[in-house]
Amino acid sequence: SSTELPNTFNNQGRKRRIISSWWWYNALNQRTLKHKLTFFLHTSFTVSKDAGTGTSTHFYDHLQLLDFYAYGNIKTLAKKITFDNSMLIYLDNTSNNANNPNENYAREFLELFTILKGPQIDNGDYTNYTELDIQQAAKIFSGIKIQYDRSIIDSDTNLPSGRISVSNHENTNKTFSHAFNNQTISVPYFSILKDGIAISSIQRNVNDPNLTITNFKKFFEVHKQSFKIIADEI
């Protein structure tokens, strides 16, 4: 143990370890449903506690965002996590620019955060989306950057948020594949992106029962011992 205060540490890695230790302890030992749900969200909307997720304060903000939406809507969380500073660094979207696209976040957004990857039925076609859809989603997410000083506050969560760099956004129409009914998102729409309208357009299957069932199975497997303890106490 240490008597030093975290704000006296120069090592960001040490700060992150302290924050994650505190959070893990609560997630694993507190019997409240909210802690369990927050831990469950972390298994899907994951960032590393180590280097590659920004400062310790960004990591703390990320954990607070999961806590805020523990009882909330997973579709709304998927929108908010897009502007999460830690996530922007961890999945490289802060490096996603119109002239140099980075598809890492777009791929995870579709495969893990929203509609899930289905059976591969053709080259680059995963039933629920295709490689073309990843490319178009990356264009939608281009220009969303980390705000290092945490000065932008989200009005819904009251937590620090990333920013929009208009000059780095791909300012062309985005046309998706047959998996999205060949939908085209026309420009200009960037002024409404922060409200999640454009992001919503690539979440058409987020309420698919397969996603709900898959997530419930994951949650039950992670916490089945907790359910037993709760049942024994009723």
Task: Give residue spans per PLM region.
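Active-site substrate-binding loop specific to GH73 endo-beta-N-acetylglucosaminidase modules
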Residues: 2-5, 19-23, 56-234
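Short, flexible active-site-proximal loops enriched in glycine and acidic residues
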Residues: 33-37, 49-57, 100
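Amphipathic interfacial helices
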Residues: 17-19, 28-36
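Post-signal peptide N-terminal segment of secreted/secretory-pathway proteins
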Residues: 3-15, 24-28, 52
